Structures are given as C-alpha cells and as structure tokens.
C-alpha cells in the first residue's frame, strides 16, 4: 500500500503488531487524526524526518497515543541519518544529536549570527556522485570544509549539549536590509497571523 492511505496504515500497524513507525510530519499528522487510539498500541518508537516536526503533531501523538515522536535529520547522501533524538537523549524542538562517528563542521554564513552551514563526513557518507558530463567516473564529495566532506546546504545551530536545531536551507534565506531572514519563519508568521488562508 501507499503511505497516502491514511486510514489503512494505522490499521496495518494494528493488525501486524508494528512496534516501529517512520514518517514525515505531514504523514504522521494524518495518521494521528485518522487512527483509533488503539491502532498504535504496540508501537514503541515513532521517528519523524524529511521535514520539520510540527509541534501540534507531536502534541497530538503524545495525548492520543502516549507516544513521543523522535525527530531526526539527514540527507540521502548520508544513508540518510545524521542526527536523531532518542528516548534517553531527547530535546524538544531539535533534531537530536549527531550519530556516533559522524563528524561535523559549521561554516559561518554572512548575515547569520547563530550557527552556520553544516558540513559532515563519516562512514555513512556516500562515496560520491556519477555526473552526466563524466560517465563512469565517481566524483567524491568535496566542500568548503575539504575533500571527503559533504555540504548539506542547511544552516544549523548546535547547543552546548550537542543538540542540533535546523534553522533553514541556505537557499531559503533572503537578505533584507543587510540581515539574513529565514523565509520559513516569514511563512510561519503569516500562517500564525491568518491560518485559514494559503500563503506564498
């Protein structure tokens, strides 16, 4: 079946006694609304990724099913996980800590005072890309941080305890009056001010 079958997935989880569930915030929102409170009775771990976890979705799952959603972060090139909240190392509104053996560097971004552009390397990083202009030649990752490093294109902040907060994509910032502004924040403010309308 497809994850878009919002009523079927909870039924399958119930019938098959699933103990782990992975999904995006969007899918988990729909599953949470469509499911009966007992559908996820065997589920012990719910992991969210690929997009920011909506706090309302996290609250819905905690109240309706007694399950805390563990948010993670990664990229396809990194097989795909880089950071993850766990039951014993959890901090709300973050994507958790880096997995063991994942190295990271933050490269400053002009106009952004907090955090930096995330570059990573580790055993889970791809070997490289095959590019159309050089068929059959593997191009290893290369970034500002050096050979073997992958530029995620994301601006993140890391707190004193090692928890990572994704601030946005570098391409999703605009320079306004000399200051870098996250377009996602503008969208969130517009939605909060007028939730019944679509916003660009």
Give each language-model segment a name:
Residues 50, 74, 96, 154, ...:
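Active-site glycine-centered loops adjacent to acidic/histidine catalytic or metal-binding residues
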Residues 104-106, 137-139, 154-158, 200:
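A structural signal for short hydrophobic beta-strand segments in well-ordered beta-sheet cores
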Residues 94-101, 110-142, 179-181:
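Conserved ATP/PPi-binding loop(s) of AMP-dependent carboxylate-activating enzymes
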Residues 1-20, 34:
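Conserved AMP-binding/adenylation subdomain of ANL enzymes
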Residues 14, 21, 116, 122, ...:
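AMP-binding/adenylate-forming catalytic core of the ANL superfamily
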Residues 40-43, 99, 197-198:
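Core-facing hydrophobic residues within beta-strands of well-ordered domains
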Residues 18-23, 32-91, 103-105, 110:
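Gly/Ser/Thr-rich phosphate-binding loop
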Residues 26-28, 53, 125:
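Alpha-helix capping/helix-boundary segments
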């Amino acid at each position: 079946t497809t994850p878009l079958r919002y009523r079927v997935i909870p039924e399958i989880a119930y019938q098959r006694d699933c103990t782990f569930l992975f999904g995006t915030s969007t899918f988990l929102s729909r599953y949470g609304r469509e499911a009966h409170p007992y559908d996820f009775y065997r589920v012990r771990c719910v992991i969210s990724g690929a997009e920011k976890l909506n706090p309302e979705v996290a609250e819905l799952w905690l109240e309706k099913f007694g399950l805390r959603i563990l948010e993670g972060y990664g990229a396809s090139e990194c097989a795909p996980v880089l950071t993850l909240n766990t039951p014993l190392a959890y901090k709300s509104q973050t994507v958790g800590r880096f997995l063991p053996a994942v190295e990271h560097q933050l490269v400053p971004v002009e106009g952004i005072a907090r955090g930096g552009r995330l570059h990573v390397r580790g055993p889970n990083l791809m070997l490289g890309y095959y590019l159309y202009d050089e068929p059959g030649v593997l191009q290893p990752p290369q970034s500002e941080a050096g050979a073997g490093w992958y530029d995620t294109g994301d601006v993140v902040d890391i707190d004193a305890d090692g928890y990572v907060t994704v601030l946005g994509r570098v391409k999703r910032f605009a320079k306004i009056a000399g200051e870098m502004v996250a377009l996602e924040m503008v969208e969130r403010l517009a939605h909060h001010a007028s939730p019944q309308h679509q916003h660009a």
